[in-house]
Amino acid sequence: MSQKQYRVAMIGAGKIVQVGHIPNFQSLTNVTVEALCDVNEERVKAIAKEKAIPRTFTDYKKMLSEVKPDITVIATPNVFHKPMALEALAAGSHVLCEKPLALSYADAKEMMDLATSKGLTLTVGSHYRWSDAIRAAKAQADAGFFGEIYAVRTVWHRRSGIPGYGSWFTRKDLAGGGSLLDIGIHALDRALFLMGYPQPLTVSGATFSKLGPQGLGLGGWGADILKPTSNTQFD
């Protein structure tokens, strides 16, 4: 029996799309990447040419209307996730949205409700849960190796300063928040994933800005990205 073929369109042509989504989707035998959309026309055309993607757009609504993709990847500044996902779902497309799914619970629920009502999949790019370390820890947790897990503390160590200073990642009007929405969401996902996504009884959190202003614009994102290790701690 032949595999079902899926046509993919992507909104956003940043680094995660270039080094992650495009090559990984193109490696699948039953998937074709049909179109790429970005507001930077020069960049999107150059990337599409390099990656052998046949069509480019600067208007995602036009892309959804003309391409009619089976799957839409959304990798744009966080503030645009909700409207773009709703448009893609309304057009009948499954959606893979970069984290965070939305900027509020109410917005996320609206997106999930629409996906459910249309029988479509809406998923989030929480890729750290698929790392070798987390998958091994999950297998051990499911096998009962840790006993009853009733509390988890998850920690993310990162250098001081603000890597990428000046980009949309550091602009609240586009990112919707700070480090909690950016890297904190991965830490929370790891903890909840390892525990089987229980319903939390209490939640507390804190963020600190004391270290942030040091070393403005110094270097890149650091060496923690995509390392096959986990800082999740079980207390």
Tell where the protein language model's regions lie, with residue ranges.
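N-terminal Rossmann-like dinucleotide-binding module
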Residues: 1-51
